Amino acid sequence: LITFTLCLGACSEDDLDSKSIFDTEEPKMNEFDNWLMKNYVTPYNISFNYRYDDKESNMEFNLIPADYDKSIALAKMMKYVWIDVYKEVAGDEFVKMYCPRVMQLFGSPAYYPNTGSIVMGTAEGGIKVTLYNVNVIDIEHPYIDIDSPFPDKSGSTTDLNYWFFQTMHHEFTHILQQKKNYDTDFNLISAGNYRATDWINLKDPDAPKSGFVSGYASKEANEDFAEILSVYITRTEAAWQKLLAAGVVGEDESGKQAILDKLEIIREYLKGSWQIDIDELRKVVTRRSAEVATLDLTTLN
């Protein structure tokens, strides 16, 4: 009774503020937002989300926002070496029809706490692609390695092919897979060599001996498919030949042959299902990747 009386005494009749304590207003459009509207939203219905949003993140990861200026640089590069590539090779309608509707950026890399493995990007339901580690971008000296058969995966690498563009082609391959199935004979070629959870222990330079272009490709068939396609089109022919050579052990060329057999199925899939010549796609990707150094990434011109 005493406590109840004290509580009553402590109450007052202050007027309630009609304004919510939660910020429900949409952020005002800035110069970058206007550029995105013109280059992503209006022509392709792509929402390029560079602002941090908890609802768009995987709470298993400890993530930070993407830097504003580096998000601008990535948006310009992504348009040049991904959107405009498919526009040039497959046509504007292809991009409008099959591109993801949401691209979400985060500034830091995403690590699984239990395994220590890193997530380069994710594709969800053919609609959304998430890219991590945007803050690694060196705006003044953008570096896209198309000449090495195996990427530098050291923590300090600034290779944008490794972090973003091969990843984007990989994730887009998953979107295409979800739209149209590929020949299931692909799944049989390396059926006995997939490593499920143990793929993380297979180093990239050793992977070709077992018929894979990377350690991650050995996880399962869908990832194998996406890895072969994305590695092939983001590397020069010289780099690809070096990768194939790593699949030869003495007189044993079974690793190399497995990669080539799977590549042939991918080649037929792209041509038959999407009317895309994989070698023309590679030619445009590598050409545009080499031209990125000439882009002005500091302005929104």
Predicted feature locations:
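Second-shell loop/turn segments in exported
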Residues: 60-68, 139, 150-163, 211-219
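Sec-exported extracytoplasmic/periplasmic mature domains
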Residues: 79, 83, 87, 173-181, ...
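Active-site recognition of the HExxH zinc-binding catalytic motif
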Residues: 145-183, 226
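Acidic/polar, low-complexity intrinsically disordered N-terminal segments immediately downstream
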Residues: 12-97, 252, 258-301
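Acidic, glycine-rich loop-and-strand cores that form catalytic or ligand-binding grooves
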Residues: 165-207
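Metalloprotease/metallohydrolase-associated module, dominated by Zn2+-dependent proteases
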Residues: 194-281, 286-301
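C-terminal motif of bacterial Sec signal peptides marking the signal peptidase cleavage site
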Residues: 6-10
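Auxiliary, metal-adjacent structural segments of Zn-dependent hydrolase domains
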Residues: 72-136
